Amino acid sequence: VDAAKDYIATLPEDSARRDEAEIIPPFGASYEVFESTGITGFKYGHHYDGGETSIHADYSVDPEYERVMLKAYGADRTKEILTYNTHNTLFYPSLTIKSAIQNIRVVRPISVDRTIIETWSFRLKGAPESLLRRTLLYSRLINANGSMVGPDDLTAYFRVQQGLASTSNDWIEMHRNFGQDKDLGDRLV
């Protein structure tokens, strides 16, 4: 993360934007940054992280995509769409949508100690090729099992499986800030 930030700092103001240098740094954010994005939860475990902000909030908007959006929706609606940032939207138990980068991640347990994790990348209808290229780059940099972020997720999943296989406790504690929820009627934040 520091190397990406250092690289960005060396670029002249008028240099071409490098998606790699923009995608990586948010994943080195502090716990406080992640906590500040908030989680909105619904019945049955469905939830989304972020909304007003997320770790993706500072990604630049692809100029071609912005032009297409402005033409289709006008300035006000385009701004509304592009400034609503979620990190993950989870449809419990195993489907995660990353709308900021058009990915769907599916976690499919196939036995007590085996899981298949798939990432599906999508091209938005009418969106420019450059946006799809960025989505695929994100998948390689973040979700791949050889990436900087993917192994952390895979290790967490593996350790959950190990914990579930143990006989020491019936529960695995996976909550934080327990008891600080605010009930808004149709959802918790």
Give residue spans per PLM region:
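C-terminal catalytic domain of Rieske-type non-heme iron oxygenases
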Residues: 1-189
